[in-house]
Curated annotation (Swiss-Prot):
Catalyzes the ferrous insertion into protoporphyrin IX. Gene3D superfamilies: 3.40.50.1400. This is Ferrochelatase. Pathway: Porphyrin-containing compound metabolism; protoheme biosynthesis; protoheme from protoporphyrin-IX: step 1/1. GO terms for molecular function: ferrochelatase activity; metal ion binding. Keywords: Cytoplasm, Heme biosynthesis, Iron, Lyase, Metal-binding, Porphyrin biosynthesis. It comes from Erwinia tasmaniensis (strain DSM 17950 / CFBP 7177 / CIP 109463 / NCPPB 4357 / Et1/99).
Amino acid sequence: MRQDKPGVLLVNLGTPDAPTTSAVKRYLKQFLSDKRVVDAPRWLWWPLLNFGILPIRSPRVSKLYASVWMDEGSPLMVYSQRQRNALAARLDMPVALGMSYGNPSLKSAIDSLMAEGVTRLIVLPLYPQFSCSTVAAVWDGITQVFAGYRSLPSVHFIRDYAQHPAYIAALKASVERSFAQHGKPDLLVTSFHGIPQRFADEGDDYPQRCYETFEALKASLGLGDDEAMLTFQSRFGREPWLMPYTDKTMESLPGKGVKHVQIMSPGFASDCLETLEEIDGENREIFLHAGGTRFEYIPALNDDEAHITMMLELVNQYR
């Protein structure tokens, strides 16, 4: 009789191995080559990526990574490893960390779990809100790895957790800590990573999941419609993305009398370039330059105890 041995695979997007041009170029090439991320025809996208985008963006992006790099490494990697370690300490089963792009790869993570005899795999993509460009890419990556296996484990794939009570409670606690430390702002802004509007039009329910998180958090905090808003960040390319845009919102708020904002990015399980540099750096500068007076960034949940407890609850559903 086959022994039942569960194991957990935590997955996040990924990060360059170092804040150098060569490492960033290698990472961006893998990331931007995924059709889930950029679905342009390959004959058009390949030369544009390799002869235009990568040579131009890699040196600039490497400097941005260097500005947020921690002593232990990339913030996303540091916090993801801490999450894995904390979860493993509270579970009596193997826990591995894999990245969709870069290292540790999904293959290395899955191989390590299979080598430990795992027969039932619990996959937790660390994306609270489903999107075809993130969670579906994890699904693709896992199936590609298992294409090389003769035997497969049972797989429990956690699609997302946008409204999970423990997730909302963890977000609420982080906002309340910020309010207690800095005072209640004129406006709480929740900034989610954007996707092309076309993806949503074609069936990706990501925007709905973001709004469901936002509404649940707003209700838990007892905030009115004029005290919190949702925006979308990190647009790339020329086609329309989900709106309102975070940077344009930060530019316009002071003119509407909003002088004090606190901003968080609930869609990021770990702080990374998009939160530390884009939100706490670029958007802070935009808001203050436009006439704002106070801007506070509320960190991602990272390895906060409430975040680990949430992960534990999600995993325990499938033990």
